[in-house]
Amino acid sequence: MQAYTGFAYVYDEYMDNIPYEEWCEYLVERLKEQGVTPDMEIADLGCGTGTVTQLLDKAGYSCVGIDNAPDMLTIAAEKLYESGQEIVYSLQDMRDFELPYEVDAMVSIADSMNYITSKEDITSVFECVKKGLKPGGVFIFD
């Protein structure tokens, strides 16, 4: 499932027209409705180059980004270095990931879940999400 190998280096340019700020505002509204407020911990599954992860961090959340594409995480790390933010990125597959600690919420946007095409794989994702969320935690995906 390494769909973005090589493409990572032009991904942000290609996705330049995407209203990430609006998406993040929408996510923050939904998270707050569920009691997940800034200062809480979020995991971003399929974080790619880290754009949404960085926006959530700027909104006050403590973030960890997970992606299975090394090139995408390389770009995310470069952007992180430039921004001075403190975000943990982890090279893992969303079908089989472990977090170092439970989080209050997980998000997966920009069609990341569309790459999960079998019933077994979607079950694996949801099992990992359940294991990684604190009791009462929230999972928002598109």
Model-derived segments and their meaning:
Residues I109-D111:
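Residues lining the SAM
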Residues G136-D142:
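Conserved beta-strand signature within the Rossmann-like core of class I S-adenosyl-L-methionine
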Residues N114-I116:
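A short His-aromatic
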Residues T123-P135:
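A short glycine-rich, Lys/Arg-flanked "PGG" loop and its adjoining helix->strand segment in the class I
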Residues M1-G46:
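Conserved class I S-adenosyl-L-methionine
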Residues E98-A105:
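A short acidic, Gly/Pro-enriched loop at the edge of an enzyme's catalytic core
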Residues T51-D96:
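Class I SAM-dependent methyltransferase SAM/SAH-binding core
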